[in-house]
Amino acid sequence: MNILITNDDGINARGIKTLAEKMSKKHNVTIVAPREQKSASSHSISINIPIKIREEKIDGLDCKAYSLVGTPADCTQAGISLLVKDIDLVISGINRGFNSGTDILYSGTVSAAIEGAIYDVPSIAISMDVKWDRDDEDYSKAANWVNKVVDLAEKKYLKKNVVLNVNVPNINEEDIKGLKVCKIGKSTYKTEYVLLEEDNDKVYQTRGVRNQVEKDESDLYFLSQGYVTLTPLHFDFTNFKELNEVKKIFE
């Protein structure tokens, strides 16, 4: 397959290189990724701002690679519309840290994959939990799991308007219990605002601690239990459960 790989951690991130190495063994890979860190960009795109694109050479990789001064969604859009022909699959990742629960709404990684689905290209987002006090993570287990998903999806499930959101826990690969297909959970946090300085503006640093995960059939719960999770996502935010009732009241 022709695979477009992107992310929100930037073209020099360890995760995207590991992913490209794995996918290049069986597929034609092109990387289009942000030139700088763009985590938590959500689905923002560059409007009325020129987008700069530069071809790159990444050590250890033979595939085409481009860095883009813009957002993760810009990268997917440019890859599909300008840089790569006949894309069969978009993969966004491997993200440094989970993209699970309602945190996916903030995620540039997930949004880059959703942008692919908007353009009718099957897409996958892949993320792995990390220890935040270090920057030497081994993403090979996440690459192995997304490779399994790609192999099976290629045979049985490549749908142009669906994103498969995959998360991998940060435990030994042999300790992973398996894969669970599940809904997203609700991510809530206790957020602390720490005052850093006070002049004309008060400058705060936010610190969030996730509240206890509920024991339900969600990605948050299964990740806490040592499973890889997979959730099918769609860009249609319509609340169909409420649609008819709202029609009766407001039309």
Curated annotation (Swiss-Prot):
The lineage of its organism: Bacteria, Bacillati, Bacillota, Clostridia, Eubacteriales. The keyword Lyase does not apply. Its cofactor is a divalent metal cation. It comes from Clostridium botulinum (strain Alaska E43 / Type E3). It is an enzyme of class 3 (hydrolase). GO terms for molecular function: 3'-nucleotidase activity; 5'-nucleotidase activity; exopolyphosphatase activity; metal ion binding; nucleotide binding. Keywords: Cytoplasm, Hydrolase, Metal-binding, Nucleotide-binding. It is found in: Cytoplasm. Its main location: cytoplasm. Belongs to the SurE nucleotidase family. This is 5'-nucleotidase SurE. A divalent metal cation binds at D8, D9, S39, N95. Nucleotidase that shows phosphatase activity on nucleoside 5'-monophosphates. One of its GO terms (cellular component) is cytoplasm. The keyword 4Fe-4S does not apply.
